[in-house]
């Protein structure tokens, strides 16, 4: 067995520099799959005092896990090998780009010398061009670097700074020889982006906003960019400056305390509950904070927002009645609005709430399950601190209408909408915050795509609650088109046996068809906080939630086609 002479090994390498920077940014776990071009780099991850390797069943799942981790931690990292590995993860990375999640994708590549020969190396396309996949990365990441020894430190800092600032993925191609190249540790912390607000723009925005607000009550519609840009405290200060009715889009669900008497609900254009739609669309002054209207969260762009009565607060610019003020950062714009409300000294009346209706009694225990029954009961099972991930199907739209307890975080993927995303993302979320119990809500078709990570949950000692909605195929697609078409069918699995086959030994598994069986299963899940609990919920093929019924209608209320 060959013996490595430690004296010939560099004390500190480019790979170490990259890892130290990631640790500095709050990363403590790195997801991925080993491959021969990244193995030596993985040795450095394993040896790093502040980092831990979390291996995944495949690269796509690793990318999804990094996304879930990044949503909670504000930064994450993914390691794959050249070509075959990175392309397998590309779908996940593209989703992180679409949904503005900061993920650093590190790709172990062939040595520079090997690339220089232009030979047909494994994992390449065989044409001697080793930048095909680097060029692909330009379309789905905000910054890219093909590291060279002389400039590696500077390029690492550039990519990581862009990822942190833009809240989107970055790409680093780390060749085997560059990874082991000697260098020096960072001398100082990674420089932060310093101020993007013009004092003149802020003053003009404040003047225009104050004039529009006057003595009016404002209403706030908030969305996920407030979370991504870490402006939640500024938004909460605005809501505390007066009695401010507020709502979110589905994308921003759980951004605000949904138990507040001033919380209106979820706004989804024409698919909204009537009271929510009226409150938002007829507000005397509407403040939209970090709002991005996508087809699936706006009722296919059926929102009716009057620009003349709207103050729109964005990442780098804000507008008042259509007049744009820039450069102006979101946090400072929200602070200015809070100051306007505080200075005017007018207290708005309480938000009118409909009279409280007595809670209906639970359904009979023997009653077959419906979508509403399932999500009503799941919602009552949630406790502060839970992280809920709902896959893009009946799970997402079933939960969107329900108010969550304070302190619950809700994660979905309504823009990218890659089914199966939430199972590995739940793994990433659980690794990011093992002290918060993860609750995964996913359909049977979606779960079949990424179910391998159940074994990783077990290996990591995690205890999620997993609700698999077994409605015998792709129900959302059936509702849109092809109700009985064979392409919306899937092979049925014995879900309660799946955890065992994937190496999960200490778990509970239930198959439920009635309300009583569901109630018993969720009660058991609450008792066993230290064990994985899988609940297979059997529902009819065409049973879909109210909100999804509205969204899949072929036409808008005015008769125009939605698609």
UniProtKB/Swiss-Prot annotation:
SUPFAM superfamilies: DHS-like NAD/FAD-binding domain, Thiamin diphosphate-binding fold (THDP-binding). Residues 394-476 are annotated as: Thiamine pyrophosphate binding. One of its GO terms (cellular component) is cytosol. Residues 351-366 have a biased composition (Pro residues). InterPro entries: DHS-like_NAD/FAD-binding_dom (IPR029035), PDC/IPDC-like (IPR012110), THDP-binding (IPR029061), Thiamin_PyroP_enz_cen_dom (IPR012000), Thiamin_PyroP_enz_TPP-bd_dom (IPR012001), TPP-bd_CS (IPR000399), TPP_enzyme_TPP-bd (IPR011766), TPP_PDC_IPDC (IPR047214). Its EC number is 4.1.1.-. Mg(2+) binds at residues 444, 471, 473. CDD domains: TPP_PDC_IPDC (cd02005), TPP_PYR_PDC_IPDC_like (cd07038). Keywords: Decarboxylase, Lyase, Magnesium, Metal-binding, Thiamine pyrophosphate. Residues 348-367 are annotated as: Disordered. GO terms for biological process: aromatic amino acid family catabolic process to alcohol via Ehrlich pathway. The keyword NAD does not apply. It is an enzyme of class 4 (lyase). Its cofactor is a metal cation; thiamine diphosphate. Belongs to the TPP enzyme family. Decarboxylates branched-chain and aromatic alpha-keto acids to aldehydes. This is Alpha-keto-acid decarboxylase. It comes from Mycobacterium avium (strain 104).
């Amino acid at each position: 067995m060959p013996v490595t002479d430690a004296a010939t090994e560099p004390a500190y390498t480019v790979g170490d520099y990259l890892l130290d920077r990631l640790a500095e940014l709050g990363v403590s776990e790195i997801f991925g799959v080993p491959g021969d071009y990244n193995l030596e780099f993985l040795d450095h991850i394993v040896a790093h005092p502040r980092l831990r390797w979390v291996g995944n069943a495949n690269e796509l799942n690793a990318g999804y896990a990094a996304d879930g981790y990044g949503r909670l931690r504000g930064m994450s990292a993914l390691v794959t090998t050249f070509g075959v590995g990175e392309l397998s993860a590309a779908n996940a990375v593209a989703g992180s780009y679409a949904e503005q999640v900061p993920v650093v994708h590190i790709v172990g590549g062939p040595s520079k010398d090997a690339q220089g020969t232009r030979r047909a190396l494994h994992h390449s396309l065989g044409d001697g061009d080793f930048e095909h996949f680097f060029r692909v990365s330009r379309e789905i990441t905000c910054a890219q670097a093909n590291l060279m020894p002389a400039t590696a430190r500077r390029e690492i800092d550039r990519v990581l700074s862009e990822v942190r600032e833009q809240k989107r993925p970055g790409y680093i191609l780390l060749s085997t020889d560059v990874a082991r190249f000697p260098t020096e540790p960072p001398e100082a912390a990674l420089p932060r982006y310093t101020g993007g607000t013009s004092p003149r723009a802020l003053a003009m925005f404040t003047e225009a906003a104050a004039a529009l607000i006057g003595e009016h009550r404002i209403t706030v519609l908030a969305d996920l960019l407030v979370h991504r840009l870490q402006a939640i405290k500024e938004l909460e200060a605005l809501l505390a400056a007066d009695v401010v009715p507020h709502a979110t889009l589905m994308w921003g669900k759980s951004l605000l305390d949904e138990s507040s008497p001033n919380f209106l609900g979820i706004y989804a254009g024409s698919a909204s509950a009537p009271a929510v739609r009226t409150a938002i669309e007829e507000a005397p002054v509407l403040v939209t904070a970090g709002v991005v209207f996508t087809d699936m969260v706006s009722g296919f762009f059926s929102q009716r927002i009057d620009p003349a009565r709207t103050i729109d607060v964005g990442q780098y610019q804000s507008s008042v009645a259509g007049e744009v003020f820039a450069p102006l950062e979101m946090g400072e714009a929200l602070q200015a609005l809070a100051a306007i409300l505080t200075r005017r000294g007018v207290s708005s009346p309480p938000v009118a709430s409909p009279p409280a209706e007595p809670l209906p009694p639970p359904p009979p225990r023997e009653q077959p399950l419906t979508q509403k029954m399932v999500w009503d009961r799941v919602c009552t099972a949630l406790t502060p601190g839970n992280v809920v991930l709902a896959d893009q199907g009946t799970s997402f739209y079933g939960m969107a209408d329900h108010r969550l307890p304070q302190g619950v975080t809700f994660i979905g993927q309504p823009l990218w909408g890659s089914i199966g995303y939430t199972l590995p993302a739940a793994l990433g979320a659980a690794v990011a915050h093992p002290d918060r119990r993860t609750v995964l809500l996913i359909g049977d078709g979606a779960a079949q795509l990424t179910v391998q990570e159940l074994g990783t949950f077990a290996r990591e000692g995690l205890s999620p609650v997993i609700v698999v909605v077994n409605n015998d195929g792709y129900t959302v697609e059936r509702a849109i088109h092809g109700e009985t078409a064979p392409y919306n069918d899937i092979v049925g699995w014995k879900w309660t046996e799946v955890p065992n086959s994937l190496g999960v030994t200490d778990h509970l598994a239930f198959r439920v068809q009635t309300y009583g069986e569901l109630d018993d299963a969720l009660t058991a899940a609450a008792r066993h906080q230290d064990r994985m609990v899988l609940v297979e919920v059997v529902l009819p093929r065409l049973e879909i939630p109210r909100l999804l019924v509205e969204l899949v209608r072929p036409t808008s209320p005015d008769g125009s086609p939605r698609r």
